[in-house]
Amino acid sequence: MKKILLASLIAVSSQFALADNAPQVDPAFAKIETLVKAKNFNEAYKELDKLAQTGNAQAIYDLGFLTQAGQGTTKNDAKALELFKQSADKGYPTANYLLGKTYISGGLGVKPDQKTAINYLEKAAKQGIEEANVDLAALYLGENKDASTKKALKLLDPLVKKGNPQAVHLRA
């Protein structure tokens, strides 16, 4: 599990330049990525905290991730949840998606709350996270109402056309 969390943190923290005009990797995140790869979580946490103090939504999210995992700091689900909410409030798409999933399942000490889950997933979907549309569609289909089914299909059909495997599976 820790390897998955570590890989996810590195993936989230990295901004890969795939084109000549793509933005350069933020040097602060490059340093943090190096620290994480070296498993120096205490220093990575300190560097993220400095960056988070400037209001950087990704840094706040990553602090939540480390706090949830107990890497570089004491494991604390309540604090992690608060950090994820702060990041989402600043418009970080991944935080909105994670919170949506959290409120579906009831993780991080919260009780499952479909209304709150839908709120976060809708924000994540509007911010371009396709998986949020799939999760929303699954929630709507679970309501077993004609209007909800229509909403679900409206979300799924564009993804099916793009070949999204989760959408194809859910649509079947």
Segments and roles (model prediction):
Residues 126-128, 138, 142-147, 154, ...:
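Solenoidal tandem-repeat scaffolds enriched in leucines and small polar residues
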Residues 50-51, 86-87, 123-124, 158-159:
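Canonical positions in the second alpha-helix
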Residues 25, 170-172:
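Terminal, low-structured helical/coil segments at or just beyond the last alpha-helical repeat
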Residues 23-24, 40, 53-56, 69-71, ...:
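Short helix-capping/linker turns of helical repeat alpha-solenoids
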Residues 39-46, 74-83, 110-120, 144-155:
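Structural signature of tandem alpha-helical TPR/SEL1-like repeats
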